[in-house]
Amino acid sequence: EIDAVFMHYSTDFVFDGASGVPYTENSPTAPASVYGQSKLAGEEAIAAATERHVILRTAWLFSSVGHNFLKTMLRLAEGGSEIRVVADQMGSPTYAWDLAQVTRAIVEGLAKGNDDSFGLYHAVNGGVTSWHGFATKIFDLIGWKEVRVRAISTEEYPTPAPRPRFS
């Protein structure tokens, strides 16, 4: 009725992570968890409800505030000299500020009548690393040489919702 745009954030959990290469917007989805299934169901419901939608799939979001990997690593480092971090899951860490800038650019484009912005996008920063590589880089950049980041497997770090191995 008001011609609004539906803006939605989704996740890499809509994929099973079995691919050895990065996923694109056209890659087939195959969620490996209930969480991923719910996110995919949300995407599908939005796309069915209106053509005037923007869905941004993001992954590995981090920032200096809130609950995220960066903050968790800093907190864990304060408690000891060794941190165990998964090394066999690959992805693209995404700075929350950059995602906000992408969102802003899309909203501004839509406000100017750019209807080409509707659809599904993957919104992540460039590059690929493992959680272990990400943690190692964090401590290298802040100069915490005394922190040891030990590589472990996904099986050694179980989670309630299985993460895609490559996203």
Q: Predicted segment positions?
A:
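Catalytic helix-loop patch of NAD(P)-dependent Rossmann-fold dehydrogenases
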Residues: 5, 14-56, 60-61
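Residue-level signal for the nucleotide or nucleotide-sugar donor/cofactor binding architecture
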Residues: 33, 91-94, 129
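Helix C-cap/helix->beta junction micro-motif
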Residues: 1-3, 49, 142
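Mid/C-terminal beta-alpha module of Rossmann-like enzyme folds, strongest
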Residues: 102, 109-160
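Short acidic donor-binding/metal-coordinating loop in glycosyltransferase active sites
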Residues: 11, 58, 125
